[in-house]
């Protein structure tokens, strides 16, 4: 598969983001910051991105979509849109989790770090990034009271949480140090699309996480 003209859909956070990789190193992006109103804007945002950059839907070669974890409704909107386009255009689609997307550049930039994504008010999806690759099966659901003991001395990256509180003894990674970008999803997703890592439409689902007695998660 060509890695040109690949569409990205990330609806896992409060910000709806779409991206378009037209060639190596040439990426266009668009966002909508009307918090969690993704269903209203996703089709229009994709259409505008393609139109402004002279790409017709029929020219797309693949789709990359965020599988989260994150907003339940937002993820369903993004996955449904990606699947519908992939089926209509007969092109492959690859799901990439937020943890997987962040890992390569975050590890190069900061070293070992913990990523946190809000689940409920005081619960978080968490994962330790200690290499450029991350296995999404290692995500855990933890309470805010557990963060210090789980990640002692390890920098924390709260995703889409500008109000995340300071925790004594732990360092928060500042936005100027690292912010998750469209390119992070596109880089990994394009690798999968070119290889054999694309997903079947039937099995591609958001990354749902349930807590079990040991704290480990099941997808």
Describe the function of each predicted region.
Residues 1-27, 33, 37, 94-219:
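Oxyanion-binding and handling regions
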Residues 38-53, 99:
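Short, well-ordered amphipathic alpha-helical segments that serve as non-catalytic structural scaffolds
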